Amino acid sequence: MSRALSQRARRTYFNNPLVEESLRYLPAAVEHPTSSAFRAYLIAQLPQSSVQTRQRFAEYISQRFSQDGQMNLALARALARYGDSRTGREILYFEMLQASPVLQEIASLWLAELPPEGSSRDSLLAFLERRLGGRDSDRVATAAVATFRRCRKISSPKPAVYIPVWSEPSPEAFFYVLARLYPERAMVRVEQLAGQPLLRAMLWPRPCLPGMLEAARRAGHVSKISELDQYHQFTLADSAEVRLGRLFGEPSSPPPSPTPEPEARKDPVPPKPVKKRKPAAGAPRKSKRKGRAEPVQLPLLPQDK
């Protein structure tokens, strides 16, 4: 039986990034939404000949991209849409940072702080030893560098020298990250967004954010961008689920209209009796027959004696 990773293990250990396998197989999590069902699917589908290797890789992927036994379906839908493309790799990289705090720390506090000429593997090992106390530093460094290479976040002009690759994301990758960082409709300051450690770990140049937000406004993910005095802020248009559905081109179904409650049965109200006015003395009375007036008995005149 599989054993879930502890919070400490998630924070201090990272191994076997399996980027290519994740890109290829994670879209199937839409049909296998629980971690146990997806793990069984991976064991049957992974190409490795050894059953033990398939089980181990299936465990890594299913645990990395699940929470409380449920797979990350936003990621699965994104990879079903974008696959092995620049956008797909950028989205997968973001979710790997989310899933592995130690990888996020390496990216935001070591890789993003490197000078333009880069640095050596020794500096990465020194960084990890201060955080991990020497435990598995070499293995974690190897896995982190492999992830950065696969997700195109570093270049190596010569062995064991790493240069960070800062690049503006595709609009689709930015819209996805915006939805995952802010799941509810809200007003957000641009400074708050720019200060997110995750955004720094993505190696997105800070000057690109205003243009990305304007693209989000045109695409309907942001409803308003405003600059008030010293505040530069934007308002998200909808919930994350609505924005992701729009991003993936999924048909949006209107919410079902509430079923009207049956009205209580009411007894018919009898009409109020109409009080007839008495005709004035001497006025001709209407006949009950239509079109005829009923003669009126006039008082007799006195007779001459």
Feature map (PLM): residue ranges:
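Accessory, usually C-terminal, subdomains that scaffold auxiliary metal cofactors
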Residues: P157-L247
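Short acidic, hydrophobic short linear motifs in intrinsically disordered regions
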Residues: F38-R39, P116-R130, M187-R200
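Short, basic alpha-helical nucleic acid-contact segments in DNA-binding proteins
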Residues: R64-D68, A144-S155, A219-S223
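Long, low-complexity, charge-rich intrinsically disordered regions
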Residues: L75, L236-K305
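Short amphipathic alpha-helical interaction segments
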Residues: Q52-R56, R135-T147, L203-A215
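Eukaryotic partner-binding/assembly regions in large regulatory complexes
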Residues: M1-V102, I106-A112, G118-S119
